[in-house]
Design a protein with these regions (language model features):
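Active-site recognition of the HExxH zinc-binding catalytic motif
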Residues: 57-69
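Post-HExxH zinc-binding segment in Zn-dependent metallohydrolases
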Residues: 71-99
Length: 99
C-alpha cells in the first residue's frame, strides 16, 4: 500500500510524514496530533527497516486516533486497545473490498 502524503478529516488536511530518529528515540512506531494536523510514522526503527505491513498498521492506528479526536471522542482515543482493534478491522475492511 502506498502511504498517503495527506488526507482530509472534516475541513482539516492531515499531513503524513516520516520521523525515524525522533520516534525511535521515543520508542514508538508512530504518533499523531489532531491539533497540528499531523501523523508521523517510522520507515526505520532504531536503524532497522520497518516492514510495509507494520508501517501500514501504524498509519491506520494513528488515523483512528485522528478521527476519534476530530469527533471529540478523546476517552476512546486514549484507549489503545480499542484504537488498535478498530484500526486493524478498518484496514481489513479496506483491503478486502471488492469492486
Amino acid at each position: 500500500m502506498k502511504i498517503p502524503k495527506s488526507f482530509k478529516v472534516f475541513a482539516s488536511t492531515i499531513n503524513v510524514g516520516f520521523d525515524n530518529v525522533r520516534l525511535s528515540n521515543e520508542g514508538v512506531l508512530g504518533d499523531c496530533s489532531f491539533t497540528d494536523n499531523q501523523i508521523n510514522i517510522c520507515s526505520e526503527y532504531k536503524g532497522e527497516k520497518v516492514s510495509e505491513c507494520s508501517t501500514v498498521d501504524t498509519l491506520y492506528h494513528e488515523k483512528v486516533h485522528i478521527i476519534l479526536d476530530a469527533m471529540g471522542e478523546h476517552k476512546l482515543s486514549s484507549n489503545e486497545k480499542f484504537v488498535e482493534v478498530f484500526s486493524r478491522l478498518l484496514r481489513q475492511s479496506d483491503e478486502s473490498s471488492k469492486f
